[in-house]
């Protein structure tokens, strides 16, 4: 595992490609990330004493709080989970256990390590997968096995702690004709001539697998997936193309080539040293002076979160994970409460406060046009699939930005999400009628914008419901 060594300036430059404005938040989060890299470079005895400087991002919805954290995790290839503080309950109440956020992080880290390991062994796994495909396409007769020998093998498997092979021995009688045909098929597979041919393979039945993330047991942190590995796997036959079957077989062969224990150790280290946990709506659990006696204590949730943020050991199915050096980012609008309403101990664990600014008209214009895959580019591409060439004039984009700013100011401030609502209403007719009409080139002008949504914007009561 290699920690990303981008400088804060490089990190901010990457974030600028996707998030408009909010320079102070980008700088703070870039410095926090760089400090983790700096800690890794220090002697071991000093590393343990340096804890991450957790951030508290304050600002209304839709200004980029979550997007900054999510994009950051992708830039540095770090395990990232987003949780909502309101989904957790204190110990003794029904609901998600706060420790599940750390378990989710380790699960993400394990998948990342697994994907990295699979990439390294893919070439070898592909060779084995192609050999299995050849045998599936050109099957050979099975050897008749002595019943006594089959019983002996079953008892031997049980004694070794594994389940007996109910399908009997896989030994084949390979004749000269079969061998020659397999050589021919192997050559055709190598040249990619059989990719669209159909083949039947056996895969694990998904209905027999435990889903650890659903139901009350998953919320309580009880891991059922470990039980599934102790149960015999039920196989079902599926018919698919050779290309699809190869990917499934490559995955199966990769699992054989990779040591799961090594992956678990690497996942724990990756989560501990580079993991990011984003706690959204943390303002909703801030204690208030008036609270009903029957209401689940918000302060209780804070006190349950506190030891995880401070640093503790949490049991996961991959082993114990220490949260001492995981970066926590709290986020909230703090409309009805203040950061000082959080318990003092939790406030102290989020020493860096960053206030995100409301979006201006210029910000909305940039959001519409500048980022990679900006909103306007997305809609142009989607409508283009119906052979309609849509263009927006500069005046139209400015008008859309002005409408978004005005509506956020006059009604509820939902930030950049307002643009989605406006564009959907603006392009409603094109999106509906486009597949059935040969419209050719369409230019979205300021007059077009005013015609489609101008009357709705002027009627404040109507705009509250539609835009």
Curated annotation (Swiss-Prot):
Subcellular location, principal: cytoplasm
Source domain of life: Bacteria
Function: ATPase subunit of a proteasome-like degradation complex; this subunit has chaperone activity. The binding of ATP and its subsequent hydrolysis by HslU are essential for unfolding of protein substrates subsequently hydrolyzed by HslV. HslU recognizes the N-terminal part of its protein substrates and unfolds these before they are guided to HslV for hydrolysis.
NCBIfam families membership: hslU, PRK05201.1
Protein name: ATP-dependent protease ATPase subunit HslU
Compartment annotation: Cytoplasm
Any Gene Ontology biological process: proteolysis involved in protein catabolic process
Protein family (similarity comment): Belongs to the ClpX chaperone family. HslU subfamily.
Assembly description: A double ring-shaped homohexamer of HslV is capped on each side by a ring-shaped HslU homohexamer. The assembly of the HslU/HslV complex is dependent on binding of ATP.
